[in-house]
């Protein structure tokens, strides 16, 4: 493991994947999910604050990557659900902009719905493959994760070609 090799040479390591996407990168409001020692995490705070708004130590080395995988798993579950809810709502004549406004103040609210125009399925398959590998290594069967892994392939196509118009910005 890289951390063990680094430790043998007196080098401190954190795993620190980032979340929240391009818009957060542009505004310096990234979320940094860290794994490593509390001392190394504390020393790094001045660095994280240059590009991130929030930073969390989740545990030992590897916990940051695990947290990132769980974030992405939930994002893609939600992204697929938004495509399906949007398609069903459009098929039933709903005004998606009005429905979105209502959902954003409901228990169905999500960051993906709030920022639908920025949701991209570019990395979704890779993300879900990571989740499935983690489940396999833990000896767990996760049927929702397996289904989402397959559905993100279609989700990517739909989002690029004919996505539900949650924001009223699609010109059809």
Model-inferred region functions:
Residues 62-172:
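Helical "substrate-binding/catalytic lid" subdomain
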Residues 1-72:
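Rossmann-fold dinucleotide-binding core
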């Amino acid at each position: 493991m890289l951390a063990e090799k680094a430790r043998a040479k007196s080098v401190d390591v954190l795993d620190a994947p980032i979340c929240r996407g391009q818009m957060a990168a542009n505004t310096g409001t990234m979320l940094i999910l860290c794994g490593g020692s509390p001392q190394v995490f504390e020393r790094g705070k001045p660095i994280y604050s240059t590009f991130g708004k929030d930073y969390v130590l989740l545990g030992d080395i590897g916990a940051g990557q695990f947290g990132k995988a769980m974030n992405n798993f939930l994002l893609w579950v939600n992204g697929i659900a938004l495509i399906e809810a949007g398609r069903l709502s459009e098929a039933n004549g709903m005004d998606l902009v009005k429905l979105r406004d209502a959902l954003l103040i409901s228990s169905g609210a999500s960051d993906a719905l709030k920022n639908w125009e920025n949701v991209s399925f570019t990395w979704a398959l890779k993300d879900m493959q990571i989740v499935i590998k983690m489940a396999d290594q833990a000896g767990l069967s996760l049927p929702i994760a397996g289904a989402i892994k397959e559905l993100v392939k279609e989700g990517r196509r739909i989002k690029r070609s004919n996505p539900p118009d949650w924001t009223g910005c699609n010109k059809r």
